[in-house]
């Protein structure tokens, strides 16, 4: 079962995404703050990260840099989401894909499959 880690501080967004992904057969872990990402990820060992740019305690780009510096997650696919114009910054930090909010949650499984098949 593919493990997805949602990194987002918006409870409603997390609840929606978690419910939809679990219905699609994904195992989901959640980190609501940037500071929670590494401890939760080290326990859950996700196959892919779905991360919001704006978090309560830090921005997602800083979290991406931390993940890329960690041997276990250096190559784990990261999808960053935001309504802000931060695509270049996110990709330069190491995100594999940037999605503009709002996005269609139903498109995520296909994107996950593509990223995991590509070995990114």
Protein language model regions, located:
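Charged docking surfaces used in two-component/phosphorelay signaling
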Residues: 15-23
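Short hydrophobic/Thr-rich beta-strand motif most characteristic of the beta2 strand and flanking loop
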Residues: 25-32, 40
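Short amphipathic alpha-helix used as the core "switch/output" element in two-component signaling
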Residues: 39, 61-72
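Alpha4 helix (beta4-alpha4-beta5 surface) of REC/receiver domains from two-component response regulators
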Residues: 62, 84-100, 110
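C-terminal output helix
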Residues: 103-114
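Active-site residues of response regulator receiver
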Residues: 52
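The feature encodes the CheY-like receiver
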Residues: 14, 56
């Amino acid at each position: 079962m593919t493990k997805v880690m949602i990194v987002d501080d918006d409870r409603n967004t997390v609840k929606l995404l978690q419910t939809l992904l679990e219905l699609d057969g994904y195992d989901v872990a959640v980190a609501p703050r940037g500071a929670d990402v590494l401890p939760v990820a080290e326990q859950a060992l996700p196959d892919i990260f779905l991360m919001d740019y704006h978090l309560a305690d830090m921005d997602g780009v800083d979290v991406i840099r931390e993940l890329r510096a960690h041997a276990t997650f250096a190559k784990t696919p990261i999808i960053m989401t935001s309504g802000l114009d931060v695509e270049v910054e996110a990709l330069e930090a190491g995100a594999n894909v940037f999605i503009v909010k709002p996005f269609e949650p139903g498109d995520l499984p296909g994107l996950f499959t593509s990223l995991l098949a590509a070995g990114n």
